[in-house]
Amino acid sequence: MTKKIDSRLLPLAHERVPRPDIYLDGKPALVLDKRTIRRTERDAFTDNLAAAEFMRDLAKTIFGPRRMIKLVLSKDGKYPLTFVTSDLQSVLKRIKIKHPAALLLAGAAIATHREKGDGCVSTILLATNILHACKKVFRKKTHANVIIDGLSLAYQKIMDLAPKLAVPDKYDAQRVIEIGVRNSLEGKLVSYDLDCVSKLLSDAIRLVGIENLTGPDGAEIVDVKKTSGGSLAESLVVDGIVLTQEIPNEEMPRRVEDAKIALIQGELRLPGKKIHRYQDYRFEFDHPERFSGFNQRNRAFLESLVAKIVEVDANVILVQEGVDDFLFDYFAKRGVLVIRRFPPVEFGRVSRALGAKMIPDPSLLVPEDLGSAKLVEERKVGKDTFVFITGCKAPKTVDIVLRGVNNWALDDVERVMKGAIKEAMTVAKDPRLVWGGGAFEQELAMQLDEYSEGIPDRRQLVVRAVAEAFESMPAMLAETVGLEAMDVTAKLRHRHSRGEVSAGVDVNNNSIGLMSSLGVMDSLDVKLQVIKSAFEAAITILRVDDVVIAGELPDPERHYLERIKGTSREKLKEKDALLE
């Protein structure tokens, strides 16, 4: 007897039955989607290493003070975006990286920059150099876990050696911070801009003081505002706060001395139409007199709302959200300056600088909640108008007003400055320095190589590979100024073997020099973070022994599988029973 086939399981005209891996209950089943790519063990390592080497090639030309620049064309929303930068973090955030290993390296680099303000390029280069050096050990049929154990051993030894290579403490704290700022800016700006920005940041840090820079709110102490027009040399350092908000009423004062400032957290108006996503309201009037009466009551309500503000004699009011138009005239007649609409982070920053308390309900305001400033004044800088608040009650904030030819140039300078501010905070917290120019990495490589001789198993090869990876860092730095990597490595080995621990690459004179004579130093804390991030990324990639890249079925096969999903015999019987 011929078994009857359920026609619902047959493909339609636009469908096709995929070739199955196995059959379950008479239906085709796929263990992996068609077009899935799978690479295991050595093939997986080779694939990940190729992605890592691509990232190394992307980063090595923007390594060091003599770095090149990248021209990036991307699409931001509907509009194409073109910008020029030598900041690798900006490039990584704009380009779309798809390979998982490359994404991991990019994430490690961005995390280092976000944490310490620098080290983005060094993280990628060191991680990829470690992987490249381990490739030789891997090809000798060394198990991945043995390589990982060797990397862990090398990392522990580096963490023990690195603090011993710190430069003797002979600089004051301010000078150490200036060195850190200068190093962060090197190569990211042209020489003239470098001097201007370095001076701006040094002046700003001197104003806020090192104690405030290392405090819990250190990241918000120095902020950057921008205005196009003029040159970078015309930029300002303001001992106080600069607001980009405009004064909303022409009759309000443009200059207030001995300001008493109230901060209202919320809005000074009737609540907006939408209370929340499930509740809304609107007003309807069936007679003009009712509308007139409503306006009168609305004004009476608003006057009662701000009565306490007038009572405490505040002459400047900062409101986080909106203000009713009626109140603009109300305050203007009383000579009170109102500024509205602040981002939450900036509002908190203003509160700390003024020594004012943020009040959610104006009726709760008391004189002790007010902040104070010697002067609140509107000024025009370039094409834009700003409100300057100086002589604050708690002077813990400094704003830098950047001026430049266009917004593209200003955006790049702003990114670089914020990274330099972060590095200044890092150096202020940990002022230890090491010799720059690749001298630190070369000395670590020499000591690691010596340490590896005492390891009796295959981990010795891994530690030597790590030493080779560190030794390649000054070689890469030398390549950026046109020197031969092998010649530089040989000369550095010779000089470090004679005890010249500060011998490194002099990028200004294209030669080998003593960094102690040139005064070239880097932050030890940044170096340690780079090493930590690079080792974590390299070990994570080495742990990968299977790469499965999911593919997609062709449309006819995908349509067929979507339609018959859930069409087991039991479910078909249930559907038939419902139809009966």
What are these regions (language model features)?
Residues G64, G117, K141, L201, ...:
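Residue-level signature of catalytic and energy-coupling elements of molecular machines
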Residues L103-A106, D118-H132:
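Elongated alpha-helical scaffolds
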Residues T2-V91, Y155-G404, D412, S568-E580:
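Extended amphipathic alpha-helical scaffolds
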Residues Y23-R38, L103, G499-S516:
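P-loop NTPase nucleotide-binding/switch module
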Residues K78-T112:
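Active-site cofactor/substrate anionic-group-binding motifs, chiefly glycine-
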Residues V137-S152:
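Phosphate/ribose-phosphate-bearing ligand recognition and processing surfaces
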